[in-house]
Amino acid sequence: MAHTLAQKILQRHTDEAITDAGQIVRCRVSMVLANDITAPLAIKSFRAMGAKRVFDKDRVALVMDHFTPQKDIEAAQQVKLTREFAREMGVTHYYEGGDCGVEHALLPELGLVGPGDVVVGADSHTCTYGGLGAFATGLGSTDVAGAMALGETWFKVPPTIRATFTGTLPAYVGAKDLILTLIGAIGVDGALYRALEFDGAAIEALDVEGRMTMANMAIEAGGKAGLFAADAKTLTYCTTAGRTGDTAFSADAGAVYERELSFDVTGMTPVVACPHLPDNVKPVSEVKDVTVQQVVIGSCTNGRIGDLREAAAVLRGRKVSRDVRCIVLPATPGIWRQALREGLIETFMEAGCIVGPATCGPCLGGHMGILADGERAIATTNRNFKGRMGSLESEVYLSGPATAAASAVTGVITDPSTL
């Protein structure tokens, strides 16, 4: 049968013939990951099931990124427990401290995930790796414990929604605007347990970082995975990351889709997701006189070098409003060093930004940028649920890097084209 991207990848990892969506299959996994919040739960389940060793010490990644640098005693205990487990099991890919970054930026940078892989992680934004052509999805810690022990897990083959983006991207409109537009169109449950498959001329024009931004937020529409065909750009990215043997592939002609959507990007303008859901999407031009006290540029969604370049281009020669805290968090040490070499860090500092280490920090209301009652933030992160970044009486707007940077300058949510 003709396969969608999701079906094609899963077929490579199972001995069962995939013939239809809804089928239950057992698949071998390429990589299993967890972080400082979810790993301790997975480790507890791993031990409870009597497992003695991980299935492959080179295909488990434990990344201490959420509450690190450790913000309090409890966070330090979580990291200590995970560190000791990693050492006991001989896990190759344990990251903490100076070599650690936000997991969904770090693993692609290190070449640990790539096209055709099946990746499971105890983190909902594991779907990020779909930008590289991997079937990647978040699981609960118990299922991740099983995958760590067995090297396999089961899936219900998801139906696929194909989203086609045509046209040429205007200035200041990027991948974040595309995925927010899609989520705004279908809702936060519009792709519930569906694979989202992205294609079209505008998708082909995106770099791999932009594709990972879009795949990252597939879960915000309820998606099981967000998938891009692996093309020449993908292979170049993976080769640069040190991978070998990857091949290009796309969905089969004649593959059956549950639903097909089409968007012409040519006339698009920057958008924001307004409180308190990622589907409450409006053009920035329609969001009038909304003041912000905090701007966050970073996260597994938009903390890569291209995002920092975009933000720096807006901030260069300008100053952050005195009423705003602008927090910039490059997503990995490698990205931090590249930003330093390019002069981006100096640009941020000259503008009056706070430049911090690679951490999830404020995205989940963990630390390094918490909102007080009545405060409002615009962020390049992926969720804006009530209380997500601090107080239940605070608000979070989601945007791309250019819009966030422009808003830092003016102190109100601002279309960067108007500066």
From Swiss-Prot:
Q: Per the annotation, how and in what number is the cofactor bound? A: Binds 1 [4Fe-4S] cluster per subunit.
Domain of life from the UniProt record: Bacteria
The cofactor(s) it depends on are: [4Fe-4S] cluster
Query: What broad class of enzyme is this?
Result: lyase
E.C. numbers = 4.2.1.33
Which reaction does this chain catalyze? (2R,3S)-3-isopropylmalate = (2S)-2-isopropylmalate
- The reply to whether Lipoprotein figures as a keyword in the UniProt entry is no
Its GO biological process annotations read:
L-leucine biosynthetic process
Q: Which GO terms describe its molecular function?
A: 3-isopropylmalate dehydratase activity; 4 iron, 4 sulfur cluster binding; metal ion binding
- Keywords, ordered alphabetically: 4Fe-4S, Amino-acid biosynthesis, Branched-chain amino acid biosynthesis, Iron, Iron-sulfur, Leucine biosynthesis, Lyase, Metal-binding
**Pathway of action:** Amino-acid biosynthesis; L-leucine biosynthesis; L-leucine from 3-methyl-2-oxobutanoate: step 2/4
Binding positions for [4Fe-4S] cluster?
300, 360, 363
Q: Which InterPro entries match?
A: Acnase/IPM_dHydase_lsu_aba_1/3, Acoase/IPM_deHydtase_lsu_aba, Aconitase_4Fe-4S_BS, Aconitase_4Fe-4S_dom, HAcnase/IPMdehydase_lsu_prok, Homoacnase/IPMdehydase_lsu, IPM_dehydratase_rel_enz, IPMI_cat
- Assembly: Heterodimer of LeuC and LeuD.
Family annotation (PANTHER family): 3-ISOPROPYLMALATE DEHYDRATASE LARGE SUBUNIT 2 (PTHR43822:SF16), HOMOACONITASE, MITOCHONDRIAL-RELATED (PTHR43822)
| Family to which the UniProt record says this protein belongs | Belongs to the aconitase/IPM isomerase family. LeuC type 2 subfamily.
Q: So what does this one do?
A: Catalyzes the isomerization between 2-isopropylmalate and 3-isopropylmalate, via the formation of 2-isopropylmaleate.
Name of the protein: 3-isopropylmalate dehydratase large subunit
Q: Which organism is it from?
A: Nitratidesulfovibrio vulgaris (strain ATCC 29579 / DSM 644 / CCUG 34227 / NCIMB 8303 / VKM B-1760 / Hildenborough) (Desulfovibrio vulgaris)
